[in-house]
Amino acid sequence: MPTIDEKRVYTDNSGTETVYLATGLGVVAVSVSDDLIGEFGVAERCHARDVATAGPFVAVATDEDVLVADRSAANGDASSTAGPSDALDFVATGFGPATAVGFDAGALLAGDEEGRIGRCAAPDDAASDADATWTEVGSVGAVRAIDGGLVAAADGVYRVDDSGATHAGLDDARDVDAEPLVATGSGLFKL
């Protein structure tokens, strides 16, 4: 028999969190509570390749551009964030086609199939991202994943900071986590 806490996933009570998934259909918003899935819906129709969140912001890597939305603007309440049924207003940032996005120290990072890594200051609101200024951080192998200041690329793992992208080792990095953990074609490694 479900407990009261488990039933709350279907209401607007506390204890729920909205997570975002990148899919071929678009960005899917899912309300979860512990191990239960509640309400879900498509937040943005596009070919989403990666999604990242930081504070109220949701960034999406697509085949056309990097898109950003402000979850707090969706319901007019700066103290809360949007749920799956709230419409998010995604705006293009001008990066171009991207394979991965991530946030690090108040900045949005993006990478593409050509290995270009760019950094953009996190906006005060998503609407200002339409005029975002991207700074090229470095060039690596095809970018596959970004988390924090780490980039997983076809030719290894890179640390990104103000001085650029520095090779941190390994080859054929498939995914990265700021722990720092790296998934490669030959196994899982801790940097």
Protein language model annotation of sequence segments:
Residues 1-191:
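Acidic, polar-rich N-terminal leader regions of halophilic archaeal proteins
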